[in-house]
Curated annotation (Swiss-Prot):
Organism lineage string: Eukaryota, Metazoa, Chordata, Craniata, Vertebrata
GO terms for cellular component: nucleus; Sin3-type complex
Signal sequence bounds: none
Similarity comment text for this entry: Belongs to the SINHCAF family.
Main location: nucleus
Entries under PANTHER family matching the protein: SIN3-HDAC COMPLEX-ASSOCIATED FACTOR (PTHR13422:SF12)
Record protein name field: SIN3-HDAC complex-associated factor
Length: 221
């Protein structure tokens, strides 16, 4: 089995005097034989000499076979294989910037995440204030049941975890209750006295009459 055959490369220190190539698959030759045709074949305005690659030699031979009066030349190959020019080397790279639509979409997604996190926190606060849990009562006395708390954010809730933006304080005949948006009722036993039920039960239940006293005899013995 034969290994991969790598073609042999020929190199020139100064490079081809026409295209500036420094390596070629063919040998470099002296340009003296072709220098007289450089001006017409490659459109040069100066004299060039030195090594010339086989590709440029073939272009000179092709130019010689052109019909008389032809103005065709291969000026485009002059210095075509030279190293990168100073202009190309110093050309700044374009910095990719985010388009307006992409920036706007990133801002919207960020706001949506903040909104979802805020709603999650509010939901957890409301769940902690649910009547199903055992509330932690404050040490407020019964004497303060008829005192209305200040409105707005300055009023202090009865429960430390009570969210007054959800629970609305209402005063009824039996005391103070807190009513939610969906009809839930939160009661503090320190501020609630079931007077209504007691009065109703007392009105429905007839008064029990005691046993009649025995008549006292006035007869003298």
């Amino acid at each position: 089995m034969f290994g991969f055959h790598k073609p042999k490369m020929y190199r020139s220190i100064e490079g081809c005097c026409i295209c500036r190539a420094k390596s070629s698959s063919s040998r470099f030759t002296d340009s003296k034989r072709y220098e007289k045709d450089f001006q017409s074949c490659f459109g040069l305005h100066e004299t060039r000499s030195g090594d010339i690659c086989n590709a440029c030699v073939l272009l000179v031979k092709r130019w010689k076979k052109l019909p008389a009066g032809s103005k065709k030349n291969w000026n485009h190959v002059v210095d075509a294989r030279a190293g990168p020019s100073l202009k190309t080397t110093l050309k700044p790279k374009k910095v990719k910037t985010l388009s307006g639509n992409r920036i706007k979409s990133n801002q919207i997604s960020k706001l949506q995440k903040e909104f979802k996190r805020h709603n999650s926190d509010a939901h957890s606060t409301t769940s902690s204030a649910s009547p199903a849990q055992s509330p932690c009562y404050s040490n407020q006395s019964d004497d303060g049941s008829d005192t209305e708390m200040a409105s707005g954010s300055n009023r202090t809730p009865v429960f430390s975890f009570l969210d007054l933006t959800y629970w609305k304080r209402q005063k009824i005949c039996c005391g103070i209750i807190y009513k939610g948006r969906f009809g839930e009722v939160l009661i503090d036993t320190h501020l609630f006295k079931p007077c209504c039920s007691n009065k109703k039960a007392a009105a429905e239940k007839p008064e029990e009459q005691g046993p009649e006293p025995l008549p006292i005899s006035t007869q003298e013995w």
